[in-house]
From Swiss-Prot:
Keywords: Acetylation, Oxidoreductase. It comes from the Eukaryota. This is Quinone oxidoreductase-like protein 2. CDD domains: QOR1. The modification N6-succinyllysine is found at K201. Belongs to the zinc-containing alcohol dehydrogenase family. Quinone oxidoreductase subfamily.
Amino acid sequence: MAARLCARCLPPAWLCRQAGQGQSRHYRAAVCTELKQPLTIQEVAPRPIGPQEVRVDVHFCGINFADNLVCRGQYQEKPPLPFTPGMEFSGVVLEAGADVSTVKKGDRVIGVSNFHSMAEQCITDQKTLWRIPENVSLQDAAVLPVSYGTAILAVDHRARIQPGETVLVTAAAGATGLAVIDVATNVFCAKVIAAAGSDEKCKLAMQRGAQSGVNYSQGSLKDAVKKLVGSSGVNVAIDMVGGDVFLDSLRSLAWEGRIVVLGFAGGNIASVPSNLLLLKNISAMGLYWGRYQHQDFAVFSKSMSTALQYCQQGLIHPHTGAVFKLEKVNDAFLHVMQRKSTGKVLLSLK
């Protein structure tokens, strides 16, 4: 049974004021009340929206590795307790503030939020919402923000992949890995080698567009890549694992190759041997998609609108690996943390 979250326990922004026009009943939310402890489902009183804000009836919310980290106090952003995790969602506009011009009540939208979208309602600024084209489902749209926003910037903005180039993608069966494969093969006409930790995950990555797969749990990634492409190497490596997998990816690059670091899912952050960069004129770079929201919003927003456009045109095909109900949010977190997931894991709020 959902618990009632008392006003005394909430940050000031959450406090329920006198009900106004468009304001609705209490809604359910997954709430972190103590770090490193299971989330609880609580009833939250809605607050009035500001003039630039939009209230959204959330249908789907993505679950990301960062959500677990923030609930453990291990993320770079540390919201005060209690808080609701969740940074991406899809849904329908319930109410728009007086100065909102980009969306209206009834519009289907995707959006990003600062860790508060694992709830039946979410309030966010109008500029962090994008309307969903008619032929794109709410579920497919919910897969797009973090995974495809990252993939598009990694493939185009950072690596600048060209048609016919060979791209090595690690953690290839994860949500972002599959998104990178999708964008690189179906939009940029690249040849992708998918690297993952099991034969089943490699098979899925190949079904989603990769030309070949390498199970790096069975031996040297570098040696396996060399067997596929010879001594010339790959043009681009996009790594989300870190540690030895990053180093093998770096050593697999061709002359003037590029490597893009998206994360360290393996838990180890490798040091970059600068002599390898020098000898092959290699470019090593990082990509933290969420940072663009604050540093270069035009680039951030374009990655979202581009993802929606690609989806509308049928160029990309978002993959949902599993869907959990809100009541099973802790099972969903465990599913992601135990590396059981492939593709995007979603919470369904309906």
